Amino acid sequence: MSGLWAQVVTQYGTFKVEIIGSLAIQVLFWWVPSAGFVLLDRLAPSFAAKHKIQPAPKQPTSSEIFDAVLISFRNQLIITGLQVTPAILSTRSSAFQITPSLPSTKDFILHFLICLIAREILFYYAHRLLHLPYLYRRIHKIHHKFTAPVSFASQYAHPVEHIVANTIPIVLPPVLLQTHILTMWAFVSWQLIETATVHSGYDFFGGAAYRHDRHHERFNVHFGGMPWLDRLHGTDEIEGLVKKHN
């Protein structure tokens, strides 16, 4: 593994490794799972119906899902542009460590956990901010078009929201830590799978999707990806979760 990674970095250089690797992560851990969740209705209709959180009449139409795909693709192009431009204009090759050596196990675990906690804090308060009436009407309302969300809706957002709430909370912690790119990719992969899952509309993985589904349905509960800040601020709707899973 270490020999293969060293060969890739040496042969292709830091710029190509970062950009191509980051795009591959998006495809493998967001586009593929999101498509899988959306196609579940056709591939396993009885199973899908059993696990759908909201009833069929509330589900988005095919044209709405296609619109979510287009907007998500646009948002990813914007982020890729923001990632590529500084790398081209700056003399510094990358904000992350891209070295022939692998990250140590200690650094990998420590940076991953710090990024996980920091992302949750940044996302929760950015999300709460976007629910202020002025910002909600002008920016965040677009994302809430999907009152019964699907995975592709996780990146269906105003460009400002996609940068401030979806991207910065994930990217800023590893940038500040100067994390190894492999640790960064592992963290981003986790976040992409999580957001595809919680927007899937299915009751998988211990109620995570149910919490965010209720946020899209009610707007004023379950702002976080994890429940602990919602519990701290009284936005967790604990009674609803208990009834749902008992």
Curated annotation (Swiss-Prot):
Record bears the keyword NAD: yes
Keywords for the protein's UniProt record, in alphabetical order: Endoplasmic reticulum, Lipid biosynthesis, Lipid metabolism, Membrane, NAD, Oxidoreductase, Steroid biosynthesis, Steroid metabolism, Sterol biosynthesis, Sterol metabolism, Transmembrane, Transmembrane helix
Pathway: Steroid metabolism; ergosterol biosynthesis
EC number: 1.14.18.-
Subcellular location as annotated: Endoplasmic reticulum membrane
Cofactor(s) of this protein: Fe cation
Motif segment (Histidine box-3): 210-216
Entry's transmembrane regions: 19-39
Function: The third module or late pathway involves the ergosterol synthesis itself through consecutive reactions that mainly occur in the endoplasmic reticulum (ER) membrane.
Comment on protein domains: The histidine box domains may contain the active site and/or be involved in metal ion binding.
Protein name as catalogued: C-4 methylsterol oxidase ERG25
